[in-house]
Amino acid sequence: MIDLRLLREDPDRVRASQRARGEDVGLVDALLSADELRRSSGVRFDELRAEQRSLGKLIPKATPEERTELLKKAEQLKADVKAADAAQDEAAADAKRLLLQLGNIVHEDVPVGGEEDFVVLETHGTIRDFGAEGFEPKDHLELGEALGAIDMERGAKVSGSRFYYLTGVGALLELALVNAAIAQATEAGFVPMLTPALVRPRAMEGTGFLGQAAENVYHLEKDDYYLVGTSEVPLAAYHMDEIIDADKLPLRYAGFSPCFRREAGTYGKDTRGIFRVHQFDKVEMFSYVDPADAEAEHRRLLDWEKQWLTALELPFQVIDVATGDLGSSASRKFDCEAWIPTQGKYRELTSASNCDGFQARRLSVRMREGKKVQPLATLNGTLCAVPRTIVAILENHQLPDGSVRVPEMLRPYLGGREVLEPVAK
């Protein structure tokens, strides 16, 4: 959530942020009114409690005649205090409900617009000219089936659409990618973690994945648990309700977990293959930092993502994601998009988001510097979303005979194998 002081002192900035996101600007004024009511309700309750305490001191000293009148007044005050307490709680709940609907304040440099209004910041690598090489590229599913690496048919038979099996070299390729990603993260100073896939509502809400994003989340209603769509959720909640000494920052974690996404609203998109699926594995970087270091850490996360994609020898571009595509928690987001030859365009492989103090406030994660205690900043960045990375590797490193060259960086994790070859049918 945003800092309420900012809302009170500069509501126009909050309105501008909501407008840039394409969200309801009226929410700002509703929240201002609710916040004022919450504060005035609190003052009213405190005044009545003070009057009640003062009256309580007078009663023992009063004469019999005075005591009767004071006791009547005390009875009325008791009812008034109870009503004021209820009004205070109701006002606080209403203000919190509205506050949780408000997105983070967008960074001033973020391009304004929707999904297609991003700005390309960098391009890396060379896009292959398959025509000049004399063959038509196959898509990742055709390649994966020939390699004995991907089985969509049985995935659909067992679990339905957007499910799959990784088999043989496909399974080995996932394990190689995960181990290589964890190795890079560990070398960069991240603490590796295997995180829970089920979380309580507060963790999901605290990271901003309920509200508008709730339609893409799997909810186990009987137990009131949520399946995570990213290990960002359990990593952000790891230090929930804690105060961290400033001299221990930054704290960096690399989480590996299964991820579950309903993919609501994507009917008809990416229906072939494993680019958009309901379940996948991912290595995620997560940082807790001093707010003053948040922008620099954001660039560091992006640099680690670029290092990873460069090591995989993939052509990619870096984009500054537009305001309408940020998600509620991020103030700014950089995506790395790899070139997918058979689609003829760049597609998202990684995201790096600066959430400032937005998640930390919701989850009550704070830092202590001297006598000062304040929310810290949280940031997250994809290192390896496995299926999409496999898609990019298969398509960009395919050879004319349907085999796939293994990027040099991955070879030690695949027993030295240099080429993945089609299996005999």
Curated annotation (Swiss-Prot):
What is the recorded name of this protein?
Answer: Serine--tRNA ligase
Q: Does the keyword Phosphoprotein apply?
A: no
Q: Which compartments does it reside in?
A: Cytoplasm
Species the sequence originates in:
Streptomyces griseus subsp. griseus (strain JCM 4626 / CBS 651.72 / NBRC 13350 / KCC S-0626 / ISP 5235)
Q: Which GO terms describe its molecular function?
A: ATP binding; serine-tRNA ligase activity
One cellular-component annotation, GO:
cytoplasm
Quickly give the catalysed reaction. Answer: tRNA(Ser) + L-serine + ATP = L-seryl-tRNA(Ser) + AMP + diphosphate + H(+); tRNA(Sec) + L-serine + ATP = L-seryl-tRNA(Sec) + AMP + diphosphate + H(+)
- What InterPro entries does its record include? aa-tRNA-synt_IIb, aa-tRNA-synth_II, aa-tRNA-synth_II/BPL/LPL, Ser-tRNA-ligase_type_1, Ser-tRNA-synth_1_N, SerRS_1_N_sf, SerRS_core, tRNA-bd_arm
> What UniProt keywords apply to this chain's record, in alphabetical order?
Aminoacyl-tRNA synthetase, ATP-binding, Cytoplasm, Ligase, Nucleotide-binding, Protein biosynthesis
Which biological process, per GO, is one annotated for this protein?
seryl-tRNA aminoacylation
Give the comment on domains.
Answer: Consists of two distinct domains, a catalytic core and a N-terminal extension that is involved in tRNA binding.
> Which positions bind L-serine?
T230, S231, E232, E284, T382
**Description of how the protein assembles with itself and partners:** Homodimer. The tRNA molecule binds across the dimer.
Q: What class of enzyme is it?
A: ligase
